[in-house]
């Protein structure tokens, strides 16, 4: 398993070591010790979710108040998605920036995002199943969304006509969410997280 920090602080890409033989494949997609060594703290598991989507579905951009905040560890166990993280932390050097990563059932990579980072994805296979571990339980009173098609974010979704839920369709734009005081601040998020080590890959290379 190798962990690589992405361009937004607090976001990591995890590449597992896959062991294949004629029977199939086995892998560790989460390892508490290697994760904590890279990130600087373990993931406090509070809830695990599965999301099944058909091609063209876009979900997001979702985020949780900080505090309490919610970190996520996301992988695709069937099909493929274009997974997107957005820095929603007001005052962050990368505020308003996004990064996209292909998650699928071939590479079986995962993405970790810390508190204050928005999350969304687009299903790019006929059906895609996303599995994610969360550090907090779902509470509709603390969860919010930014419109995934906000022109200020300019996310390059790999679909011509995205399928959105009514909730995501009615979500605020980034500027509206900021003006409404809904976005977390970088300082508040820093107070609830442990600083990450310097950029570089962490983990064993495998046999």
Swiss-Prot record:
SUPFAM superfamilies: RmlC-like cupins. GO terms for molecular function: dTDP-4-dehydrorhamnose 3,5-epimerase activity; isomerase activity. Pfam families: dTDP_sugar_isom. This is dTDP-4-dehydrorhamnose 3-epimerase. Keywords: Antibiotic biosynthesis, Isomerase. dTDP-6-deoxy-D-xylo-4-hexulose 3-epimerase that acts together with NovU to catalyze the formation of dTDP-4-keto-6-deoxy-5-C-methyl-L-lyxo-hexose from dTDP-4-keto-6-deoxy-D-glucose in the novobiocin biosynthesis pathway, an aminocoumarin family antibiotic that targets bacterial DNA gyrases. Substrate binds at residues 23, 28, 47-49, 59, 72, 119, 143, 167. The active site is at 62 (proton acceptor), 132 (proton donor). GO terms for cellular component: cytosol. The record marks 138 as: Participates in a stacking interaction with the thymidine ring of dTDP-4-oxo-6-deoxyglucose. The keyword Isomerase applies. It is an enzyme of class 5 (isomerase). It is unclear whether NovW acts before or after C-methyltransferase NovU in the novobiocin biosynthesis pathway.
């Amino acid at each position: 398993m190798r962990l690589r920090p992405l361009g937004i602080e607090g976001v990591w890409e995890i590449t597992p070591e896959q062991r294949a033989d004629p029977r199939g494949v086995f892998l560790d997609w989460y390892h508490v010790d290697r994760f904590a060594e890279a990130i600087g703290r373990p993931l406090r598991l509070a809830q695990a979710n599965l999301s099944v989507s058909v091609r063209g579905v876009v979900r997001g951009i979702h985020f949780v108040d900080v505090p309490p905040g919610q970190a996520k560890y996301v992988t695709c166990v069937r099909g493929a998605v274009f997974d997107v993280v957005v820095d929603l932390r007001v005052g962050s050097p990368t505020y308003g920036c996004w990064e996209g990563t292909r998650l699928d059932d071939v590479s079986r990579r995962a993405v970790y995002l810390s508190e204050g980072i928005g999350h969304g994805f687009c299903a790019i296979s006929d059906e895609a199943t996303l599995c994610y571990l969360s550090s907090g339980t779902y509470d509709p009173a603390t969860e919010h969304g930014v419109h995934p098609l906000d022109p200020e974010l300019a996310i390059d979704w790999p679909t011509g006509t995205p399928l959105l839920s009514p909730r995501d369709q009615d979500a605020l734009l980034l500027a509206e969410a900021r003006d409404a005081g809904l976005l977390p601040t970088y300082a508040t998020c820093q107070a609830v997280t442990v600083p990450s080590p310097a950029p570089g890959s962490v983990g064993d290379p495998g046999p």
